[in-house]
């Protein structure tokens, strides 16, 4: 079975909440322990939520402090080292900024984070990461939810007697 962050199209394995809702999440599933994972319709929406959450809650912190907060203090030194190894410009003391998140290294950072969360490479293309970044920072619109066929209203059926009575009445109506 695929990791929950892949099944939910939630690359950061983020919890449900206002940010997840802003980017289209309408439900969540349990994802181990007492954790919850927001569910997204597209990978780009999940990525956009991840970028936005980092931009609003994890900037002006060092990489080490931001990962410590993000992970709920779970394996944070290893997690931060994993991230720093994949983005050459990062060190444990790098202060996370919105400018960094908007940059080419910003989406590479999110891509690395998704790999840590999934435990394997995340199934998103670089173009999907860029699109998520554009959505998060207002350079692209949030895609509409996938079309769902409306359930047709039931059509009332008439009994044979009701139809016969209506027919007979119609014979006596004046035209």
Residue ranges and their predicted role:
Residues 1-175:
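Cell-wall polysaccharide-cleaving catalytic domain and substrate-binding groove, primarily
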């Amino acid at each position: 079975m695929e990791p929950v962050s892949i099944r939910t199209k939630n690359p950061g394995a983020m919890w449900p909440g206002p940010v997840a809702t802003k980017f289209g999440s309408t439900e969540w599933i349990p994802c181990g322990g007492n954790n919850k994972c927001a569910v997204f319709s597209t990978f780009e929406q999940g990525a956009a939520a991840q970028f936005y959450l980092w931009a609003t809650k994890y900037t002006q912190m060092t990489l080490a402090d931001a990962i410590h907060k993000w992970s709920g203090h779970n394996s944070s030194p290893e997690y931060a080292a994993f991230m720093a190894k994949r983005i050459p410009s990062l060190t444990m003391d790098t202060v996370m900024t919105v400018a960094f998140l908007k940059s080419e290294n910003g989406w590479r950072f999110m891509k690395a984070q998704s790999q840590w969360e999934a435990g394997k490479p995340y199934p998103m293309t670089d173009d999907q990461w860029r699109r998520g970044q554009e959505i998060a920072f207002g350079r692209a619109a949030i895609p509409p939810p996938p079309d769902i066929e409306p359930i047709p209203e039931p059509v009332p059926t008439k009994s044979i007697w009701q139809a016969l009575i209506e027919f007979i009445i119609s014979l006596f109506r004046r035209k």
